[in-house]
A protein has these predicted regions:
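Active-site proximal beta-strand in glycosyltransferases
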Residues: 1-35, 82
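Short catalytic/ligand-binding loop motif for oxyanion handling, primarily in non-cytosolic enzymes
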Residues: 7-12, 71-75, 92-94, 116-117, ...
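Membrane-proximal helix-turn-helix segments that form the acceptor-binding/catalytic region
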Residues: 22-62
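Helix-loop-beta element that forms the nucleotide-linked donor phosphate-binding surface
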Residues: 54-65, 69-89
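Conserved donor-binding/catalytic core segment of Leloir-type glycosyltransferases
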Residues: 83-119, 125
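A conserved nucleotide-sugar
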Residues: 107, 125-151
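Short alpha-helical segment that forms part of, or immediately flanks, the ligand-binding pocket
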Residues: 153, 175-180
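Acidic donor-binding loop of glycosyltransferase active sites
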Residues: 157-170, 181-184
Length: 184
């Protein structure tokens, strides 16, 4: 079984046991009440789909999780068969990273239109916009919305750093792709 994202264990454990300081479902001991978190809890906890996920996890031979936070949700229930294997990146040619410090930081943030609050990009965008306002001569800010992954990667090129998910502990695909190209 693959534990790679939204499922019954992720929704239940982060809403009930709360082993992480923050997640898609909690900040501290408080449950997040944004639209996406509420909808995902309703979709996975105590539903046929959620029960199927529980059954599959119980009956499978092994569970592979792709992020540390997903491992935290499966491992307490299935310590003998839960394994964390980080998401891979395909290493291409070595990125060209300039040795000199740029005059302006080129900062990139990609926004998923309907998932901004859920991912925390709304908070990061406000912070970046404040820095841009306070230090316009120090920051170039590129904001994109709703791009397919290939276009996202092309648009990100030339950036020094990206802002991605506020509530994630481990790099997901966008930051891994960025690091592969020498972008922080």
């Amino acid at each position: 079984l693959g534990g790679y994202g939204m499922d019954a264990y992720w929704a239940y454990v982060c809403s009930k046991d709360i082993p992480l300081r923050y997640s898609d479902f909690n900040i501290g001991k408080e449950l997040r009440q944004n639209e996406e978190a509420i909808a995902e809890r309703k979709d996975w906890i105590g539903t046929d789909k959620g029960r199927l996920n529980l059954l599959m996890a119980d009956q499978c031979d092994g569970i592979v999780t792709g992020l540390y936070e997903y491992w935290r949700c499966y491992e307490p229930f299935f310590p003998e068969k839960t394994t964390f294997i980080p998401f891979p990146i395909v290493i291409g040619k070595e990125p060209n990273i300039p040795q000199e410090t740029p005059e302006k930081l080129n900062l990139f943030i990609g926004i998923s239109k309907n998932r901004s609050a859920y991912k925390g990009t709304d908070i990061m965008l406000r912070a970046a916009e404040k820095v841009k306002k306070d230090f316009p001569d120090k920051l170039n800010l590129k904001v994109v919305t709703g791009l397919p992954f290939d276009e996202y990667v092309r648009t990100m090129m030339g950036s020094d750093a990206i802002m991605d998910q506020l509530y994630s502990y481990t790099p997901s695909m966008n930051p891994l792709e960025a690091m592969n190209h020498g972008v922080i």
